[in-house]
Amino acid sequence: MYICPVEYEIKPHQKLNLGLKEIWLFREMLFFFAWRDIKVKYKQTVLGFLWAILQPLLLMSIFSLAGSALNIPSESLPHPLFTYSALTLWMIFSTGISNAGNSMISNANIIRKIYFPRLIIPISSVLTALFDFLMAFIILIGMMIFYHDRIKFELDKFLLLFPVSIIITVISTFGIGSLLAALTIKYRDFRYVTPFLVQFLMFVTPVIYPISVFHFTGSKYLLAINPMYSAVELFRSGFNGQILELRLVAISLFFAVMLFIVGIYYFRKTEADFADLA
């Protein structure tokens, strides 16, 4: 009995094409990479997945104490809630781009041996960061319940703004992460540049301070160039009673999309050389 062999034709990718159909065909590999990264991250740790919660909690404690000592305003929110709400979102961004930046080098052996859509690797890094966010988000819900009498929680507003903030975060994380992944495999110096980039971006994002601390004209529009500015502010808007200007959201969303396009373009442009560079 003759069985017709299955053939898979590898074609050059269009540089702005995500290749969603191909990624869907390799979806099991995508979930394998994501779950493997999650298990490896917490392997041989006593507390395991609890570190996804403890890390932002410990940072919250430090920043809240510093904020209280320095009289940094917190937009009428309790300092712990003000800080922790931003940190949970920030962890997606910082963890996502840090892991994605090193992902091609970490998976060098697999890249050299078999073919699969290379974008699966940075996507799995973002999925891993989203898993940590979901773990930390459980504590955030508990904090909102605990501080219910001191916040202005509006369910309909929160349900509207929460997805928008997540979308901005994921788009910008994937864009920068893909760009860094392609740059790092070619220029290993970026392994040392990325941590400084993450730290710098954190201090230009209103994680531990409100935008009101800046008094010069146009400061909010300048900061809105950073997509995480609007992402964090939108996230908080669901329970601090404030409304972010639509123009600021538009600016952040524009730059998030631009980062996404640049990241995908450069990744697609250079991915043919990954196997040789790995």
Briefly describe each language-model feature range.
Residues 1-278:
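Hydrophobic transmembrane alpha-helices and immediately adjacent juxtamembrane helices
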